[in-house]
Structure formats: structure tokens, C-alpha cells
Amino acid sequence: MHTEDTQIANLLIESGIIKDRELQEINLLAKNAGLSFYDAVIDKDIVTDETLGQMMAQSSGYPFVILAKTAIPDELFHLTPEKVARRLKVIAFDRDQTSIKLAMADPNNKEVIEAFAKKTNSKVIPYFATDKDIHNALRMFRKDLQIIVDNLLQEEISKSKVLSADEAPITKIVDVVISYAYDDKASDIHIEPEEKSSLLRFRIDGLLHDVLRLPKILHDRIIARIKVLSRLRTDEHLSAQDGKMNIKTEEENLDIRVSILPVADGEKAVLRLLASKNRQFTLSNLGLCDHDLTKVNKSINKAYGMILSTGPTGSGKTTIIYTILKLINIRERNITTIEDPVEYRIPGANQIQVNPKTNLTFASGLRSILRQDPNVIFVGEIRDNETAGIAVDAALTGHLVLTTLHTNDAATAIPRLIDMKVEPFLVASTVNLIIAQRLVRKICDMCKIPLTVTLSTLAQYFPMEMIKKNLGESLQFTFFKGRGCKICRNTGYSGRIGVFEVLEVTNEIKKLITEKRDAETITKQAVKDGMKTMIEDGLDKIARGVTTLEEVMRVTKVES
């Protein structure tokens, strides 16, 4: 363990928060999920970021500051260039005539302290602040993207230059747009031609937000720049093109998948950001409760059978499969996947890209995989009867098969497989677990406020029995919402989490499958067996202040 990790571990053990066994679990989680020890502690909800920060500050003998609750003068923020502040994880937050207070992730960094003392001609008083708090403070002071781009354009207009795709301003505009999208944890960038302008939008937490409007004359040049970076044809404007690029950020090399499509007013580009720093998921931080975690862990440790992840497009199906694959990825196992596309690389796994031009389909690829001595197989999606049949046969003959289906709930996956000409007895014999999910936006921690909701309001959305079971007997309840702040773009939400229903195929459910009973009957039996429905999991997350009633209703309206 690193020195800081050892310090954190000792603090948690000495304070009685964890025992040696839990320390081993945290170390294993950090290793499997690619998290730092600090982040693994936070992920397991052992302590909050703020509490752990206070403990570390007290242990190291430095005062602790919460920047989110501190009014920082603009002039102090601008003492340090933003890139430097991000790299060093420092921010000045207060000063008087003789001294300056400096929030630092590493207050022992004498070099930084001396540099600030020399620059400001003041005594530097170092404070400890968490990485997350410093990052959010820097975001609060970040210049608006529109202002930055307008300034870049104004500089060139003053030079009376006509801009081409490889001119510095166009290059800088593309770079700064990607940098802002990455920092905002956007999944996609949309660059859309309009009649008189070019509109840029970021998809953040599943929803699109307008972020920038440019003169129409720049649109083609920006598209051309993206084509150059993606190695696409710059002279082709009437056909769709797909490509990819790699951009180096301060934190990682960022893979970006690019789609160019001709539309009415020009060419539209969509850039999918495949950021590994935002993909350090664990089953718990995806939103699975302890009860469901137990069921998932039981199934993924079986040598054979099938695990299905179901839900509409964009509901997080592939994310949970990737997370499971990372957990079971050991050298003694041969993990082989066939995907369309391969979005994220899994070290040690053999990942195959579907290619219809060479007749490499899900079905043909799956047949070939079975001759490669696999232990674990991931099929990106079951789209047809042939793939369904081969996948079930693979699960029946000693392989653990993970795959996805488009269904609204867990139980509906069973009749869907039967509709794909898989015999009911084969479905009953092979399917171990079905995970259905949706993604809800999480309430922003920076602007969370309490909210009173009456029983009569809740009863409009949830069965009374479910309310009493999960919340107890009361006429009103205290939930939470986000007021809206700069960190969350005034939406009240920041980040997403899953709401789940995890259906374990018990002996009773196997019997219902062989009898070809409908999804509703299977769901009722699964609930008897202890399954928490998706809407019930949503209610639990509302009660715990994770998300809001509006969010749960938005994504589970089919069920409600």
C-alpha cells in the first residue's frame, strides 16, 4: 500500500470504523475496479468524502477546509492558471495583508508552498482539502465555454483572417469543446448545423444541454477538423462516415467514437466520449442494494449458465456487464467477447468487433468463440433467433454467458427468449439471473435541500402496501431535491445511478418457465421469492436522498 493508503487504513481501523476483514475487502475492490484506496472507501459508503477529509487533516496536523462552503474571491482564484491548479490540486481561498490560505490535496508539498509564498510575497498557510472539493471549486470558477470561444474568434477577426480546418483557432475550439465535455462528464457531443448557426450540445446524465452557438460559417471547418482527427474523408459530404480519434487530456488518453451524417443544413457530428476515468464502476456504486449484490455475486461465481442484462437503449446494460467482467477477470479464465462496437478495452480479455462486411456477425462470431476454449463469453446483444440458440447452447455446455436484451422488465426476458425459438426447458436450465435496470439522475450534493412529501402524493405513484413496507406509517415524509447550482448546471442533479430489479431463477420460477407462464405470473413469483421491483428500488433511493420522485417516475413510467 502507498503511504497515504496506509494512513487512511490506520485512521479507519484506529477509529473503529473498519476491521481487518473490511480492509481486505476495500483493497480487493480498489484493485478490481481500478480505484484509489481513498475512492474505494468512499464507494463502499464507509464514510463520506468530507468526513474522511476531516480525519486525514486532523491526523496530519493541518486545518481542514470545505471549499464548497467557502466564499472564494475571484482575484484569488486567478492567482493560479486553471491547468496548473488542476494538476497541483491547489486553490487559494483567503488572504489578509500578510498571509494567504491555500487549500491543498497534499499540504506537505513544500515546493508549491514556497512558489506561492514567492509569487504573493505572503506567508502561506496550507489547509487540507479533498480532491473532489478542489475539483468542484475549480469548476465553479471555470469560464463559460461561449465566452472562451468568442474570445478566440475575436482574436482572429482582429487579424482579418479566414479560418481553415487546421488553423489554430479552429483547432483550439475543437480542443476546448472536448475538454469541457470531458470535465462535465458528458457522454456525447452533438455538433448540429442550423439554418443560420451551428449548435453544440452535451449529453450529460442522459439529457442534452445546449452549450455553445457558433456562426454558421465555422460549422464546416469544425466538421473538417473532426474528420482530420478521425482520419475520415474531408471531401465526402453526402455519405455517412464513422471513425474514431484519440485525444490526450491532463488525466488520460481519451478515445472518442465519431459519427458524421449529412442532414438538411449540412453535416452533423456526434462524438461519443469513452472516458475510462468515468468508468471506474463497482456493482455497489452502480446502485445495487446489498440484497441484489448477494444474488449477483452468487451468479457470477457459477461456472456456467446465463446472466441477462435487460432494458432500453441507454439504460446501462453494457456498463453492468463490463463491471461484472472486470470482477471475474482473472488470469485463470479465458474471457472472450463479441461486441458491436467494442467500447472499452478489458485487459486480458479477447474482444471481437462485429463486422458484417466479412460475415463476422454475433452468431458466426459466437460459433468461432466456442472453438477458442472460453470460460466466460459476453455477447453484446441477442438480436435474432440464431444468436439466442447458440448462446443458450453455450451456457448449457459449461460456459458462463453474459448478454443483453431489450425488454422493459426482468421477467419479460423469459418469454422474449421463448419467442426466439428457444425451448422453455432450455431457458429454465440455463438462465441463472436477469438484471433489469434504468438510470436515474442523482441529486446534486452541492445544492441538496430537504423536501416534504405527503402520503397522499406518494400514493398517486406507489401502492400503499409498498409505501408502508419501505417507509413506515406516516402522513408525510422528508425527501430531498437539488436547488440548482453552477456545479450541476442549475439542474439540481449530478451523476446517474441505476434502479434495478434482479430476478434470480429459483426452482419455482423454473417450473413456471417450463409451463410457459406469462411475465406477470413470473414477476409475482419472483416478488414472493424476495425480488425488489424496479419501482420499489426507486422508492428506496428516493427515501435515502439519492434521487427524486420525478426521476423515478420518468424512467419507470412503463411499470407504474
Where are these regions (language model features)?
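NTP-binding/hydrolysis catalytic cores, primarily Walker-type P-loop NTPases
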Residues: M466-S560
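N-terminal "pre-motor" subdomain/linker immediately upstream of P-loop NTPase catalytic cores
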Residues: Y62, I72-D74, E82-S315, I320, ...
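Residue-level signature of catalytic and energy-coupling elements of molecular machines
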Residues: L12, V41, L102, F116, ...
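Amphipathic alpha-helical transducer elements in NTP-driven molecular machines
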Residues: D5, G34, D49-G53, T70-F77, ...
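Non-catalytic accessory regions
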Residues: M1-E114, K119-V124
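Cys/His-rich Zn2+-binding cysteine-cluster or related metal-binding knuckle/ribbon modules and their
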Residues: T407-T506
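Switch/coupling sub-region of P-loop NTPases
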Residues: L293, N297-I307, T313, T318-I443
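Short, charged, intrinsically disordered terminal tails
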Residues: M1-E4, L458-P463, R554-S560
